[in-house]
Amino acid sequence: MFRTLVKTDALAVEDQTVPVRYFELRTLRGAKRYSAEILLGPGDRIILDDDSVTNLEARTACLVPATIYSRMLARTTAAA
C-alpha cells in the first residue's frame, strides 16, 4: 500500500517549529485513511491516524504541545 502526501504543516511551540506531514492511504476495502507524521527530532516521530485530515489536525494541535512540554518537564526532573 502506498501513502500519498496530501498536506504539510508546521506547528510552533515555544521556540520550536515541528513539521507535520499528512498522508492518505487506501485500505484493501477501498476506504480512505489518513495519517500524520510529526517529526519531533532526528529519529523521533509520532504517527497518528484517523478517518479525516480535519480530525488529525485537531489531534495534532493538542498532542504536539503536550508532548513537547512533558519531555521538557522530564528533562528538567532528570537533571535535578
Language-model features and meaning:
Residues Q16, A31, E57-A58:
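Extended rod-forming repeat segments used as scaffolds/tethers
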